[in-house]
A protein has these predicted regions:
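Active-site microenvironment for binding and transforming phosphate-containing groups
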Residues: 1-153
Length: 153
């Protein structure tokens, strides 16, 4: 899967091309969509669990907290084919932690990994405006952000 190979290939390429050692590397993560807002399907959970032993710790199940839906669930049922129900928890994935864990697995020490930790989908400025662009939250109609990879000789 792509999500696993980005960190592995990036660090592998740096080792081959530049002789970089993981213990000498610094990494910064974020901002990015947080586990609070990043819902995924069962297939994503399955893919992660097939590749990472720690995958279960990356997922949380979020249940609808609407008290009316909780008290009167039959009011919100829709006629859907078997197996296509949206009743049940949303599965949320912590991509930021997933990336941090992959960097650790690649040999970087925890002290060399900085995490911003702000969610691009829900972090707001004091005036209520978005602090970041969020492709997922804004359905693709967004500005852009920049990431930088550099090397100091």
């Amino acid at each position: 899967m792509l999500f696993r190979s980005i960190v592995e290939r990036g660090i592998g390429t740096m080792r081959l091309q530049f002789g970089s050692r993981p213990k000498d590397l610094l990494a910064a993560i974020g901002p990015g969509i947080g586990a609070c807002c990043y819902s995924v399907g069962e297939e994503v959970r399955f893919d992660f669990e097939s590749q990472f032993a720690y995958a279960p710790s990356l997922f949380t199940e979020v249940y609808d907290s609407d008290p009316v839906k909780t008290k009167y669930p039959l009011l919100f049922l829709t006629a859907r084919a078997p197996g296509h129900s949206n009743i049940g928890p949303q599965i949320h994935l912590d991509l930021i932690e997933a990336n941090r864990r992959q960097l650790l697995d690649a040999g970087l020490s925890a002290s060399k990994i900085s995490v911003v930790g702000e969610c691009t989908a829900c972090t707001r400025l004091p005036n209520g405006q978005r602090r970041y662009f969020s492709h997922r939250d804004e359905h693709g109609y967004t500005g852009r952000m920049l990431s930088v990879i550099g090397m100091i000789e």
